[in-house]
Regions:
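Alpha-helix N-cap recognition
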Residues: 51, 164-165, 314
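Hydrophobic beta-strand scaffold residues
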Residues: 44, 94-95, 123, 144, ...
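Active-site nucleotide/adenylate-binding loops and adjacent lid/helix of ATP-dependent enzymes
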Residues: 2-10, 27, 59-61, 104-185, ...
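Short acidic, glycine/proline-rich loop/turn micro-motifs
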Residues: 17-20, 155-158, 302-304
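ATP-dependent carboxylate activation and anion-phosphoryl transfer catalytic cores
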Residues: 115-120, 249-333
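Phosphate-binding site of ATP-dependent enzymes
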Residues: 166-260, 283-288
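ATP-binding N-terminal substructure of ATP-dependent carboxylate-amine bond-forming enzymes
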Residues: 1-96, 100-101, 105-107, 111, ...
Length: 333
């Protein structure tokens, strides 16, 4: 590959989303990626997308062969992530990762489920409600998970997200409506193992070996869910007791089902270059897709990168492969 001038766009370091995943790390993912690209001979510079009008002007004047897009929203609004990608398109910028259509489909968890149902990918039964209006509903049994329909990174999903009664459900809905101005997703709770599968590629996409978040040692009485406490609150017992591992006891038919669901979902949701899919595997080996994550975290300890390593790739090789995939997409137009 020719040496490129690459703009690394990212949310500000002071952003809580960035600070959460920096816990215990010396560098941000933007810094790690810049080092990889520079060692490969590329020139890099950073562009902070912080929601201020001047950052839009800065993007409009960017002189780069490619944008390595790490932006997670616009200002403090996660739901504006697709808008940033759309702005790149308007400016004619070439960039890594999913475009506005794929980002929008994956961000709306209810819409994701409807699309995947058409493609026969199993997801938990669900309902959506917004300020008293029921928009969609299956017949769901308790317990249920109650979460924002358009947030990611476990935002809005604490241990209290698990509701076992009408009273708990209504209290949880009220809390989320107070915090987020969009519908609430009520989802059948799937008791089982938490499995993450990365996908890399485009027309010839590849699924990585699965990575498991072992929740079996959470404090007694806490629900076995990947809550914000488990993922981000570093000083808590819940955070310390949840460990990532490579499962070696999944049956071949389960591995095949996970791989098929991940690759089918990647194409159905029109994702590009790389993504991560979150699954639940029940004790009777049923596979449920819980969430699609386009443009997942790429720091060296992230779930996606762990899966890449299990596939035989190093962290630098994975970053450079994502870069090459984006380059190839634009060359083939």
């Amino acid at each position: 590959m020719a040496r490129l001038r690459i703009a690394i766009t990212h949310s500000p370091d002071g952003d809580p989303r960035v600070q959460r995943r920096r816990a215990g790390l010396r560098k941000t993912d933007a810094q790690e990626i810049a080092e990889v690209l520079r060692r490969a001979g590329h020139k890099t510079f950073f562009v902070v997308v912080d929601g201020a009008p001047k950052c839009l002007k800065r993007l409009a004047s960017v002189d780069a062969d490619l944008v390595f897009n790490l932006v997670e929203g616009f200002g403090d609004d996660n739901t504006k992530e697709p808008h940033v990608a759309a702005y790149y398109d308007l400016l004619g910028l070439r960039y890594t990762g999913s475009g506005p259509r794929g980002l929008s489909l994956a961000m709306d968890k209810a819409l994701t489920k409807k699309v995947l149902a058409f493609h026969r990918v199993r997801t938990p039964k669900f309902a959506t409600v917004f300020r008293g209006r029921l928009d969609w509903a299956h017949d769901i049994d308790f317990p249920v998970i109650v979460k924002p329909v358009r947030e990611d990174g476990s935002i809005g999903i604490g241990f209290s997200a698990l509701a076992g009664s009408i009273k708990e459900l209504m209290e949880r809905i009220d809390e989320l409506h107070a915090d987020f101005n969009h519908p609430v997703l009520i989802e059948q709770y799937i008791d089982g193992r938490e499995i993450y599968v990365g996908v890399i590629g485009n027309a010839r996409a590849e699924a990585f070996p699965p990575v498991e978040l072992d929740l079996s040692h959470l404090p007694k009485g806490k629900p076995r869910i990947a809550s914000v406490e488990v993922k981000w609150e570093e000083g808590t017992r819940a955070y310390r007791s949840a460990k990532l591992r490579f499962p070696d006891d999944l049956r071949r038919e389960v591995l095949d089902a996970i791989r098929h669901a991940a690759l089918t979902s990647f194409q159905a949701l029109q994702l590009r270059d790389y993504a991560r899919f979150d699954f639940r595997i029940t004790p009777d080996n049923k596979v449920y897709l819980i969430e699609a994550n386009p443009n997942p975290y790429l720091y060296s300890g992230a779930e996606f990168i762990r899966g890449a390593r299990a596939s035989g790739r190093t962290h630098p090789e994975t970053i450079l492969e994502i870069l090459e995939l984006a380059e190839e997409r634009y060359r083939s137009r």
